[in-house]
Amino acid sequence: GNISTALGIALASKQTFAVLGDLSFLHDLTGLIHREEINCSFIVINNDGGGIFSTLPQRGVDGFESVFGTPHSLDPAAIAKAMGISATTISSVDELKKTLKAPVKGISIVVANVPSRDENADSLKAIYESMNSI
């Protein structure tokens, strides 16, 4: 999974940041069970489900939320803490910048709470459209 891959990459580095979505984090939790002396900070983008799927044409059709959105209402930081892993939650760009400037010591989880999946998808669409017009 994504967590195990990031940890493997981090073995060859002094410190690593890995970015993944909340669903990827939840699916790959077992990768955090056997920890080595690895310096890897996971930035978990938490939009309560599969945000990437909200960019697809099926967004808004009947059944979309249960099949693609898959909201979970879980707290990734609380789950990480229950596993004995350092975890914090951020909700601003300034907090993210501060996190990225700090040294990475061991394995940690930084949960970045972001706008709703729909707002996020609309923002991505606007970015893609502006890039296509260049």
In which residue ranges do the predicted regions lie?
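Thiamine diphosphate
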Residues: 1-134
